[in-house]
Amino acid sequence: MEVPELGPGLVERLEQLATCPLCGGPFEDPVLLACEHSFCRSCLARCWGSPAAPGSEEATPSCPCCGQPCPRRSLRSNVRLAVEVRISRGLREKLAEPGARTGRRRGGRIPTMGCLDPQGEDMRKTWRRFDVPVPKSSNSEEDLPEDYPVVKNMLHRLTADLTLDPRTAHRDLLISSDYRGVSLAPPGTPVPLDSPERFDRLRAVLGAQGFASGRHCWEVETAEGACFRDSLAKDEDAGESCYAVGAAGESVTRKGLIKLCPSEAIWAVEGRGGRLWALTAPEPTLLGGARPPPQRIRVDLDWERGRVAFYDGRSLDLLFAFQAPGPLGERVFPLLCTCDPRAPLRIVPGEA
């Protein structure tokens, strides 16, 4: 996995991982439930209330995020998450210091701030407190050490391992054998039968995995610089449309023409005319000025906060964010659209 250059976008993503879904602030004494959701211990205590008196029966409390029953005795201290909270705070503080900068080495872009030297006493205390091996020291502005285990783990957690659902794919689309790639099928390709799940006008496919709670992220590789005179929607001229990447609610219309916008349960960006556009309503929003679309687009879904954000997958610079007034209210799936055999899209395998 290529580690992105350290910057505000990366720190923001790390902070999102270190944020309690109940209070919206950094985790304090985080605990892990049986369903794998984490909360501040005090936040969960307020949510669940006091335990029943000894000898009396108590209904099993449920997870505030997913609703799964989670006995109190199943709570565990999330030590690794506590370490990550400390690290994300440290990165934010150090990034704000005068003279903080990043660098590059060996063609890869890796966090390279000398002020993140793990010889720093505060950082050493953090690692030792949680019984994590202290990384090798470095006195120069070199790369973050390769054996920096918790930071690497945090970065690996930033992407989910997803596949595409061929049952939803428009009949003009071809899904790769590993169910991660999609392209417009060449002439002569056998056409599958129509079904209620399948898009019949929008050349789109949904992910096989949907989300009804939590924070999730996936990356999509695009055909950078491609610019084609075709349409995302069959028989509809949308100009030089090439592809769209984003997320769609389970209720998204599968039949007929669809306007790609949040009111239709679609949050997406579109590569068109050599530019990247956020598919807002009533008109799309141009992103990045004259710069070409990135080769890799990262989609961040924060279900409870109603936020779908898009980042440059290499630099982690924020491209655009859709914000709903509250939780998204339904299961949300990855969405990929493409309209030309020269413009394939591919979900990048997640690393865990």
From Swiss-Prot:
Tissue specificity as recorded in UniProt: Expressed in the hippocampus. Expression is rapidly up-regulated in granule cells of the dentate gyrus after LTP induction.
Cellular component terms (Gene Ontology): cytoplasm
Zinc finger (RING-type): 20-67
GO MF term list: ubiquitin protein ligase activity; zinc ion binding
Keyword Ribonucleoprotein included in the entry's annotation: no
Domain B30.2/SPRY: 142-352
Pathway(s) per entry: Protein modification; protein ubiquitination
The UniProt record lists the keyword Cytoplasm: yes
Principal location class: cytoplasm
Enzyme class label: transferase
Subcellular location: Cytoplasm
One Pfam family named in its UniProt record: PRY
Reactions catalysed, as given in the entry: S-ubiquitinyl-[E2 ubiquitin-conjugating enzyme]-L-cysteine + [acceptor protein]-L-lysine = [E2 ubiquitin-conjugating enzyme]-L-cysteine + N(6)-ubiquitinyl-[acceptor protein]-L-lysine
Single GO BP term: regulation of neuronal synaptic plasticity
Keyword terms: Cytoplasm, Metal-binding, Transferase, Zinc, Zinc-finger
Region (Disordered): 98-118
Family annotation (CDD domains): RING-HC_RNF39 (cd16592)
EC number in record: 2.3.2.27
Purpose of the protein: Plays an inhibitory role in anti-RNA viral innate immunity by targeting the adapter DDX3X and promoting its 'Lys-48'-linked polyubiquitination. Alternatively, enhances the cGAS-STING pathway activation by promoting 'Lys-63'-linked ubiquitination of STING1, facilitating the STING1-TBK1 complex formation and STING1 activation.
Name of the protein: RING finger protein 39
Native organism: Rattus norvegicus
Top-level taxonomy: Eukaryota, Metazoa, Chordata, Craniata, Vertebrata
